[in-house]
Every structure is written in structure tokens, then in C-alpha cells.
């Protein structure tokens, strides 16, 4: 017997609508579960306004790369933040790669990750909170991208405090502030170059960096907190010619010119008032020590005079030039 088409009554239509709704809910759940198992198994996270914050890590460690997006309910949501303490005390973590989608790294995110040796920070990060790499003592080098404006926020432990294996820090051109305690007890750090953008450095930022020998500033002298270089007895601060607000000491350390420029004028060589001399030109107010010896085969250099290049120029004359068959000169800055 052939059956004709079934006519839906209002009751049947309600049943069909309910079934469609349930199907949509089931489909959403399936899409959520469709997020790659390897990714879901490694991270816990929250969502807010279409963006994801990584809040924890449950993976096996080793080399970890954060995803830049996650598919949630059929939507690709960007990973924009790493929450506070998200990877704290994860002893199995060896390296971490942070994608360009991440804009901020929360307090203590990698606190006490004692086997962390390599960090790649994406070009989207603008701020790094306090304590992020606290006591990551196997971390040896780090590059801070140009996008970062602040290293720490003066709310807790320093960003790199007690990273005792850290030997090299490369700061991007966007960094304006370095918070207190930022590099405290980085005992292997031997030098650091600060970009022109740096305008403030917090208290004790480089305290107990016992291997530190040179701190190089490309810009003007920044404002500082107290005891910036406490315990850094072998360090010297260097600043570039033409920058401002520098005096003979900075943060308790001697401050001297970095890459000073000096030259002599061949046309000025000659005898004046029975003394041989020449004009020295170079960086304004640079102090120059003129040394002399009598031969280059076995040179014994002795200071003859100390000149200050007031206005960028000074004339040197040798009162002893007639006492030797030959007098050879060199210049140095104290």
C-alpha cells in the first residue's frame, strides 16, 4: 500500500523545532571537543570578549609552543594573554615560544621554572609583569622585542630576579621603564645595553649583579630609584656623546663616555714658544691624557699632560720635548 505525504500538525512542528535546537547544542559541543586533543590536554584557559587567556599547563613539559588561536565553538579565538602563575614551578618546562598574538604576560607566569633554558617572546607582547621569570636560574639569554614598553610593574618580585645563569639581555627599542628589582641577583650578567627609549629605572633594578662590568646607555640619563647597582662593585656606566643629564656618577657607579671621539690636526703640529705641540679635537669636555715614549720597540709610556677638550678642542704642548732624541705620543681617556 502506497503511503502519501505526511502533513505536519502544529504539534509535530514543535517537536521538529525542539530537535533542531538539540542538534545545534550537540553540534556546538562536538565542535568544542574537536579542538585538537594535544592542545586541549596541555592548557587550561578562559575566554573573554572573544579572546583567550592561558591559565595553566598540564602537559609533559619539554619544548612548548603556545598556540596563537584556538577553535572554540567553531570560532577561531586569539590567544592574547598568559595569566598569572600559569606555568609557575613547572620543573619539566625546557623552552617556551610565545606567539605574536599574546600582548601581556601576567605576574609570575613562569615563576620558578628551574629547567627553563630558552624563551622566545613574540612581537605582540607590550608588557611583562613582575616575577614572570623569577628564579629561572637556567635561563641564559633573552631577547625582549621592540613591542615591549615595560619590564615589570613595581608590584612584586623582579621580572628576572635570581636568574643566576642569565648572561645576555637584548632590549628592544620600545622599552621605556624597567621596574624595581627587575634583574636582582642576576649574578652571571656581565653587561647590558639600554635603548634610547628608557626613561625610568626602579630601585635595586640591578642589585647584586656581581659579574656586571658595563652598563651602556644609548639615550639621556633616566630617572632612577634608590640603590640601583647595590653590590655591583666592578661595574661602570657608559653614555654616548651628545646625550644629556649625565654627571660623573650614576646610581653610585662611575659614569664615563662610551665611544668618545678624538683626533689630532696634522696642520697644528709644530713648535710654539720653544715647545712642540699640537691641537686635539673631539668630544666636548672629554678629558684626554697625553702619554709619551722614546721608542716603539720597547715602549714605556709615561703621562706628559692631562687636557680637557673644553668646547671640543685643546692645545697640547710638551715641555720635555728637547730632552729626548725622539718623543712619540699617544692619547687615552682616563
Functional labels for PLM-detected ranges:
Residues 2-27:
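Bacterial N-terminal signal peptides that target proteins for export
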Residues 15, 31-38, 83, 91, ...:
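Short, intrinsically disordered, low-complexity terminal segments
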Residues 21-24, 28-31, 35-56, 217-220, ...:
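Short, composition-biased motifs enriched in small/polar/acidic residues
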Residues 47-49, 61-81, 91-104, 113-127, ...:
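Structural signature of tandem-repeat unit edges
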Residues 84-86, 106-111, 129-134, 156-161, ...:
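Consensus positions within tandem repeat domains that build extended binding/scaffold surfaces
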Residues 231:
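Basic phosphate/pyrophosphate-binding loop/patch that engages nucleotide-derived ligands
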Amino acid at each position: 500500500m502506497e503511503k502519501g505525504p505526511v502533513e505536519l500538525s502544529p504539534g509535530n512542528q514543535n517537536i521538529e523545532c525542539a530537535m533542531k535546537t538539540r542538534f545545534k547544542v550537540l553540534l556546538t559541543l562536538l565542535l568544542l571537543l574537536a579542538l585538537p586533543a594535544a592542545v586541549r590536554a596541555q592548557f587550561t584557559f578562559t575566554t573573554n570578549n572573544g579572546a583567550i587567556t592561558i591559565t595553566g599547563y598540564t602537559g609533559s613539559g619539554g619544548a612548548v609552543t603556545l598556540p596563537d588561536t584556538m577553535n572554540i565553538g567553531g570560532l577561531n579565538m586569539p590567544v592574547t594573554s598568559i595569566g598569572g602563575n600559569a606555568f609557575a614551578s613547572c620543573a619539566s618546562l625546557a623552552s617556551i615560544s610565545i606567539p605574536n598574538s599574546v600582548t601581556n604576560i601576567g605576574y609570575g607566569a613562569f615563576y620558578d621554572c628551574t629547567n627553563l633554558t630558552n624563551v622566545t617572546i613574540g612581537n605582540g607582547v607590550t608588557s611583562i609583569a613582575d616575577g614572570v621569570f623569577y628564579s629561572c636560574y637556567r635561563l641564559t639569554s633573552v631577547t625582549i622585542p621592540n613591542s615591549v614598553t615595560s619590564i615589570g610593574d613595581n608590584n612584586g618580585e623582579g621580572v628576572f630576579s635570581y636568574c643566576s645563569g642569565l648572561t645576555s639581555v637584548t632590549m628592544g627599542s620600545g622599552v621605556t621603564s624597567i621596574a624595581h628589582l627587575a634583574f636582582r641577583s642576576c649574578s652571571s650578567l656581565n653587561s647590558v645595553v639600554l635603548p634610547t627609549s628608557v626613561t625610568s629605572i626602579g630601585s635595586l633594578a640591578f642589585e647584586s649583579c656581581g659579574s656586571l662590568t658595563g652598563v651602556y646607555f644609548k639615550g639621556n640619563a633616566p630617572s632612577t630609584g634608590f640603590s640601583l647597582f647595590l653590590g655591583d662593585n666592578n661595574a661602570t656606566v657608559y653614555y654616548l656623546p651628545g646625550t644629556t643629564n649625565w654627571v660623573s656618577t650614576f646610581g653610585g657607579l662611575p659614569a664615563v663616555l662610551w665611544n668618545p671621539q678624538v683626533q689630532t690636526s696634522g696642520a697644528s703640529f709644530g713648535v710654539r714658544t720653544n715647545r712642540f705641540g699640537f691641537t686635539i679635537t673631539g668630544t666636548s669636555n672629554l678629558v684626554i691624557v697625553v702619554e709619551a715614549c722614546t721608542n716603539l720597540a720597547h715602549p714605556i709610556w709615561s703621562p706628559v699632560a692631562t687636557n680637557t677638550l673644553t668646547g671640543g678642542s685643546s692645545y697640547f704642548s710638551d715641555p720635555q720635548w728637547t730632552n729626548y732624541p725622539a718623543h712619540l705620543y699617544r692619547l687615552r681617556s682616563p
